[in-house]
Amino acid sequence: MKVMFMLALLFSSLVATSAFRLPFQFFGANEDFNSGLTKRNYYESKPYKREFNADDLTLRFGKRGGAGEPLAFSPDMLSLRFGK
């Protein structure tokens, strides 16, 4: 009975140590696991950032009016906030 307990204890310790050792042995300890992530500069602009467009505001804040209907948001209002 003691022999079976010692064998089970040795086998479990072997399994526990191989769980940490084998991945580094087969996959390499110096492999970059975050290869898909690129670290960018904090102040660098985002490449997928859209340009600001006045039509975006007209579509968001008011529907485009017909012939005589005024817009709920006019692109001329940009000069009040953005100085353009």
From Swiss-Prot:
Q: Which GO terms describe its biological process?
A: neuropeptide signaling pathway
Q: Which UniProt keywords apply?
A: Amidation, Cleavage on pair of basic residues, Neuropeptide, Secreted, Signal
What range does the record give for the signal peptide?
A: 1-19
Disulphide-bridged cysteine pairs: none
Name of the protein in its database record: FMRFamide-like neuropeptides 26
User: Does the record's keyword annotation contain Secreted?
Assistant: yes
- What family does this belong to? Belongs to the FARP (FMRFamide related peptide) family.
- Kindly list the residue ranges recorded as spanning the membrane: none
The principal localisation class reads secreted
- Tissue expression profile of the protein: Each flp gene is expressed in a distinct set of neurons.
- Where does the UniProt annotation locate this protein? Secreted
- The record places propeptide residues at 20-48
Q: Which domain of life is it from?
A: Eukaryota
Which residues are recorded as modified (Phenylalanine amide)? F61, F82
Role noted for this protein: FMRFamides and FMRFamide-like peptides are neuropeptides.
Q: Name one GO cellular component term.
A: extracellular region
